Each structure stands twice: as structure tokens, then as C-alpha cells.
Amino acid sequence: MGKFNLGALRVRQNALAQKSSGKISQTPCWVDIVSEIPPATVLVRNLPQQHALVQQRVKTLPGKSRPQTVIEEREIRRIKTKKASRMFQPMQIRYEEDELRKQFFQDHPWELARPRVVLETNGNDHARYDWSRLQQRGKRLDGESVVQRQLYLLNNVPDITKGEAYDIARREFYQLRLQEDIERRVAQEEARATGAYFGPDMMQVGMELENQEYDRWKIWAEKEAEQASQRLAAFAGATGGAKEESDPAILPELEVAESTSESAQPAEIRTG
């Protein structure tokens, strides 16, 4: 059958053959079950299931006076240029929070640099949060708070758009961040007034270490450049010195030529 292995389909047949030949003393207990419910014989692989993006909105439908909760399903666009080797891989499950989270952290990349606590007590901490307000008890304010607040507005406020919900959540986030900065500054001033001393923070320490490393590298680079120039100069000087030492008779001949030229020049002038 080529690359197809049908050994699993013949497991009952092999077990009965081994029992009849005496290789095994007892018939396996699963023989009757396999005869009633045989393994699947379909060799065609089906494509993985497409997961739709489910959204909950509160909208005022035509002909209705009160807004109603509507569940919308949006199909995810398939990627046409998909490799054949990835055709049967499971499809990615997407949630509405993924798009909101991507938009927020794209607009606020420095929020990813803030330390976060990802430890949970029982895995159900989200159940006690009430996202009708942005600030939660027992949870530090971060970008995830903005995402959950925006999702709450989209799911509960009638006829609100994604941009409006994002602006509301972002405005509340900026106000709380400003309040935290003011509280931190006031606490630092009060502590200094009572004699507290604050050393450099982690960012300043890191910058100082980086400057020291740069200075060490600069000294090393200057030494390397100086040694390289000395090697080139020594090589050129050794070549010229070797030529001069190989011909010691050149210097006396040059001295004799210079003396004769000096003595001959005034004589020519007098005769003229």
C-alpha cells in the first residue's frame, strides 16, 4: 500500500491468527469490541475547522425601541498563500481582545516595559473584577485594564463604536496614570523632607554601567589602533633600513660627489 500503514486496521485479524496458531493462550478482551466498532478506514484528511470571531454588541435594531444584545460572528479571512505542509495544521483561535490589545500596545509601546505580575491564585481572578470602572482592587493598572475596559464598553453600551470605547478607556487610563505620578512625586517630597535619601534608580544605574563599558571599549580601541599603526611603521622602517645596510658603499660615494660639486661650482663662476 505504499506509505500507508494499515496494521492498525488488521489488529483484530492478527489477534485471532495468533490465538489460532497458539502464540497467545487467551483471546484479548477487546476483540469483540473492535469487531462491533472497527477503526476508521477513511484515508482522506479533512481541513481543520475555521474558528469565527464572536462579538457581543448592544444595538438598537430597526423597528425596536429598546437596544438588544446581538451576537455577531465574523469569518476570518483565509490566507491563500499557505504552504502545502501547513494545510492541515490547526487554525489559530482568535478573540476580540487580541485586536484591542494590539491597537493599544501599538500606540503605547512603553507600557510593555513596565513590570507586570502574572501570578494568579486559583486561575479565576478575573471573576472578581468589575470593569464598569477602570481601576480594580488588587490589580495594578496596566494596558490589560484598558483592553478589558474597552471590551466592557463595547459589550454593554448601546450603539458605541470601537473608537469611542477606546477613547473613553484611554482617557480614564491617562487620568489614573497622572494621579499615580502626582502621588509618587508627593510621597518622594515628603520622604525627603523627613531626611530620606534616594539613590539612582535602575535606569540611571544601567546608563552608568553602559557609559563605563563604552569608555573601556574606547581605551581598548585606541590601543589597538596605535599598535596597528606601530606595526605598519615598523614594517616600513625595517624595509628601508635593510636597503641602507645592504649597500654600505653608497654613503662614501655620495659624500665624494657632493664635495666635487661644491668645489667645481665656484670655478665655473670665476671663468665666466
From Swiss-Prot:
Molecular function GO terms recorded: structural constituent of ribosome
Pfam families the record matches: MRP-S25
Keywords: Mitochondrion, Ribonucleoprotein, Ribosomal protein
Assembly description: Component of the mitochondrial small ribosomal subunit.
Primary gene name: RSM25
InterPro entries: Ribosomal_mS23_fun
Organism: Coccidioides immitis (strain RS)
Claim: ATP-binding is one of the keywords in the record: no
Name recorded for this polypeptide: Small ribosomal subunit protein mS23
Region (Disordered): 236-272
Source organism superkingdom: Eukaryota
Compartments, record wording: Mitochondrion
Cellular component per GO, a single term: mitochondrial small ribosomal subunit
Lineage start: Eukaryota, Fungi, Dikarya, Ascomycota, Pezizomycotina
Annotated family: Belongs to the mitochondrion-specific ribosomal protein mS23 family.
